[in-house]
Amino acid sequence: MGASVTTGLQMAAARPCIPACQRLLGSRAALPSFGRALSTQTGFASCRKTASAGPFVSLNHKRFAVRAMSAQGLPIDLRGKRAFIAGVADDNGYGWAIAKALAAAGAEILVGTWVPALNIFETSLRRGKFDESRKLPDGSLMEITKVYPLDAVFDSPEDVPDDVKANKRYAGSSNWTVKEVAETVKNDFGTIDILVHSLANGPEVKNSLLETSRKGYLAAVSASSYSFISLLQHFLPIMNPGGATISLTYIASERTIPGYGGGMSSAKAALESDTRVLAYEAGRKGKIRVNTISAGPLGSRAAKAIGFIEKMIEYSYVNAPLQKELLADEVGNTAAFLASPLASAITGSTIYVDNGLNTMGLALDSPTLST
């Protein structure tokens, strides 16, 4: 069972952080949300250049990291709740941060890890590699009750092609399709209360949409959006009424982000649309709330496959209303709120956690503003 915080979670401002132009974020996550401010021409300018962009940008700015801490106040109390987080494969991404926040609020944590990454993840846990990042606000370590092998691209054993079955990266693992994992969780624990989808993959993400193959496009949609539908299909029967589901999306669902291709923008748009439809269906069928978080850029291992994540981190810092580093914990805290009774009337919503970058319609680092 994850450690409980009897006084709940409360937000507090921590010490100023180093500007992104001096230190780029190096934590890990699944494919991130990047922002929606419009860039022009070359698009990404350094902080030095942007400081001379006229009256739009202040020369003297500080940023503060907002972290959760245990203190007296309105509590996020998830004691007695059980969460399944799909898509945790390391200790620095959004999925991990969400797991920590839920654990800090008292929830029991189960995770689903991509089969080829399972051995490394479990070995790292056993050897204490993640102990520092497992620390909760009360000083205890987050406990993961069980790690399940999972490949959410496949709904049932009948869907798994022979080449995957024969792949040595899947050797030694079993019962890892969505249907099998849901059945195993039911056999192990009976029910869950919180379902988190932290999964995304676009094999052709570096390709423009015009250069994306049908196979690559459909693979992106399958792994990044339909996987959520499949998870909810199979886990809904074992979710307690009043439970919640949370997924992670990206502003490319609404705005053009050159470089985020391969059908990933379409997949995120589908995920947000599905969030609204599933909010109705799961709400009526199981009294389950369905929301998605549109998070800002995070320098994850997966995101680095896109090729320009560090520039997007800097771009976000320069152009967002709040000029501060976006922490994975801030996304985790939002997820804990959405999973809690405090958000009991919120469903079908896309919640932006990006320092406000989604509100911007002008890129302050545009070369045109410096002339």
Curated annotation (Swiss-Prot):
Main localization is plastid
Annotated active site residues, numbered on this chain, are Y250, Y260
Transit peptide span, please give it. Answer: 1-67
**Which reactions is this enzyme annotated as catalysing?**
a 2,3-saturated acyl-[ACP] + NAD(+) = a (2E)-enoyl-[ACP] + NADH + H(+)
Matching Gene3D superfamilies, A to Z? Enoyl acyl carrier protein reductase, NAD(P)-binding Rossmann-like Domain
Q: Which UniProt keywords apply?
A: Chloroplast, Fatty acid biosynthesis, Fatty acid metabolism, Lipid biosynthesis, Lipid metabolism, NAD, Oxidoreductase, Plastid, Transit peptide
Record-level Gene Ontology MF annotations: enoyl-[acyl-carrier-protein] reductase (NADH) activity
Amino-acid positions noted as binding NAD(+) in the UniProt annotation, renumbered to this chain: G87, Y94, D151, A152, S198, L199, L248, K268, L298, G299, S300, R301, A302
* First-tier enzyme category under EC: oxidoreductase
Q: What is its EC number?
A: 1.3.1.9
The biological process GO terms on file are: fatty acid biosynthetic process
According to UniProt, this protein's pathway is: Lipid metabolism; fatty acid biosynthesis
CDD domains per the UniProt record, alphabetical: ENR_SDR
Cellular component terms (Gene Ontology): chloroplast
InterPro entries, alphabetized = Enoyl-ACP_Rdtase_NADH (IPR014358), NAD(P)-bd_dom_sf (IPR036291), SDR_fam (IPR002347)
Q: How does it assemble?
A: Homotetramer.
Main function: Catalyzes the NAD-dependent reduction of a carbon-carbon double bond in an enoyl moiety that is covalently linked to an acyl carrier protein (ACP). Catalyzes the last reduction step in the de novo synthesis cycle of fatty acids. Involved in the elongation cycle of fatty acids which are used in lipid metabolism. Required for normal plant growth.
The UniProt similarity line reads: Belongs to the short-chain dehydrogenases/reductases (SDR) family. FabI subfamily.
Which protein are we looking at? Answer: Enoyl-[acyl-carrier-protein] reductase [NADH] 2, chloroplastic
Q: Which organism is it from?
A: Oryza sativa subsp. japonica
Starting at the broadest rank, the lineage of the source organism is: Eukaryota, Viridiplantae, Streptophyta, Embryophyta, Tracheophyta
